[in-house]
Amino acid sequence: MEVTVLIPNYNGLKFLYDCIDCLKKQSIKDFRILVVDNASADESVKWLKENNIDTLVLDKNYGFAGGVNAGIKEVDTAYTILLNNDTKADVYYVENLLKAIKTEEKVFSVSPMMIQAQDNNRIDDAGDGLCIIGFAYQIGVGESIKRYEKKMKVFAACAGAAIYDTALLKELGAFDEAHFAYLEDVDLGYRARLYGYKNLYEPSAKVIHIGSATSGSKYNDFKVKLAARNNIYLHYKNQPLLQLIINALPIALGMFIKFLFFAKKGFLKAYIEGIKEGFASYKKCKRVDFKKVKLSTLIIIEFELIINMFKFVLHFIKRRIDRLY
């Protein structure tokens, strides 16, 4: 057995049947399914036990990061797939992710083609990006799936359906539990990149994703606050002091843009609270050991952050164009 499919769950009973049923229909059968339940208040645990699904039941809600980390400690296979409960995997999903992570050396993670449940012709996520103004973004979201039929390198994998090298996952410290939820996958992918590993996108592995099943909506106070706070953590942890100084103005610009955006959306208070909490508590985060990071790697990533700014704008334009058809 080479891979464990790890499914974090919190009050997700209504999604579990479809998610696990798709896994039972996979082209390969030799893998473990492990559900980590974050103290659900619905009947998730009862259903899982009745259906003989291997389940790790936690005593409280540790968030995505804490829940997944608890599950990772129980994994003894070479690879770990993290799969959101609100997904439906294509029959070749597990097989094609396994093939993809073995194709190159120094691959840490591989992100599949995540497809929007409400429109199966559009991308939900083709990996995650990060740009110089501090915006983390879903690559391809809202665009036609036809634009994303080729393999490529990505800044980070989306932990909603990605495969990871288990040994590296544990070596890198897995997910930062200070994040609780949101941006923890970008943080992990960034960390892997700094230490010289790659994150890939594999279009032949496909999942349909509902999205925001646990938090309840695209934007809410909880999500906006945590994402704002975690964005502070993300930069503090993964950029040395000189790089933070160089990027201070672009990041401030990004924060100002989000300030205006969330003011318009009615979430300004939550955004400001998140920023305040981020600056008040960032030192509790464990920074990357920059003594182990090559200068050339930092320079390459800095240029990538700049290039990703243009890619982010291009994605925005393409998304608007695709909506016309």
Where do the PLM segments sit?
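Conserved donor NDP-sugar-binding/catalytic core segment of glycosyltransferases
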Residues: T87-L130
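A recurrent flexible, glycine/aromatic-enriched loop bordering the glycosyltransferase active site
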Residues: I123-D124, Y137, E143-Y164, V186-L188, ...
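Non-catalytic, C-terminal membrane-associated alpha-helical segments of glycosyltransferases
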Residues: L244-Y325
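A conserved acidic beta->alpha catalytic loop
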Residues: C22, D37-V45, K60
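A short, conserved alpha-helix in the catalytic core of glycosyltransferases
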Residues: F155-K206
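Glycine-rich, basic loop-to-helix element that forms the pyrophosphate-binding segment
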Residues: L58-V75, N85
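Short, acidic, metal-binding catalytic loop of nucleotide-sugar glycosyltransferases
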Residues: D21-D30
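Short aromatic/hydrophobic "clamp" motif used to bind/position activated sugar donors
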Residues: T80
